[in-house]
């Protein structure tokens, strides 16, 4: 019978041989470093992020090798790291000092960099207590990779809990307080009835007259979290509606079913775009029956006459040594990725603030997919769409099984965002 310890050692040797077949097996068990490739040699791209994250949790030094072997990771050659990689099915290779020195010499000569990661970020996901684990792609990615997180919602945000975290994720929350504008088209559906009841009860418990007022206050708290140095990552509806909520202070942008009064017909002209993170000069959707919020979204998936077909988006190349943050956010083993729908699928170029960094777009299209920027001492990153491996995303679809998509380039972008707050800030020479 093979003991567990022997199995782990055999697994580590096998995986390392797959990473670099020429290395003798007797050198694979003990070495100063553990190298995790992130190119096509990797057998489990998504779980590799979890291995790096847990090494940081143990207080180990991790380096992110930007633009080298698909954005590889270099860990100490500890027994804990080797065991974790083996049990996670992650391709990992013990390497010696000479191998690392040669790799870093190559990195120094090209558009690459070795970025030290200092500590595991404290992660929070903003979601209702009753949200299922498969309700958003980030929750699924975190669970699959083995990254621990806390779930928080309005009461925790209003209670100051954001200060306990470094990184916050938002997904399909509608910060305009209109229940994703599903009310008229899905009236009577049990899931919608529960959503409305839960949100109304929360708003009342926090002293707000209605859900739109509650969500606007939550959006302002989240913006304050970023200003004080927090890292915000949002997808799908949360991207667009967060900015609409921030820019609509004193402006009624909600339908009557949400706050008892109709939307101000002149709302688009009254918005305070200086308060928004990413967008400006958007035109709001006036119809309460169309599940579209504004022309920020380029694909308009729920507007029959404006809906755009899916294509693919291309990740931009950045200077790893000069622009390490943008470079970290686009690390991947693929540069062109199939697009996927969400209530907010993409971001029109026309509505982007000049300060926004575009990380990925559909070449030649009037929209982009993946953007980044700063607010105060912190940063935000917006990624359009709901689930990279569920391109059409219909209500009631079965949850995505990430074990079927361990190499998903779309999901890798999510996990890049989880790790980049751990990076040691580098002073640039001027």
Give short role names for the model-derived ranges:
Residues 181-317:
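A glycine-rich, often tryptophan-bearing local segment used as a flexible ligand/cofactor-contacting loop or short
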Residues 25-136, 145:
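Hydrophobic targeting/anchoring helices
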Residues 109-113, 167, 206-209, 421:
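Extracytoplasmic/secretory-pathway proteins
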Residues 1, 18-27:
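C-terminal segment of N-terminal export signals and the immediately downstream linker at the start
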Residues 6-22:
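N-terminal export signals
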Residues 136, 143, 240, 270-395:
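Catalytic beta-strand/loop cores that center a nucleophilic Ser/Cys/Thr
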Residues 25-37, 44-74, 252, 351-430:
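Extracellular ligand-binding/catalytic regions of CAZymes and related secreted enzymes
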Residues 27, 33-34, 39, 43, ...:
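Helical hinge/lid and interdomain linker segments adjacent to catalytic or ligand-binding clefts
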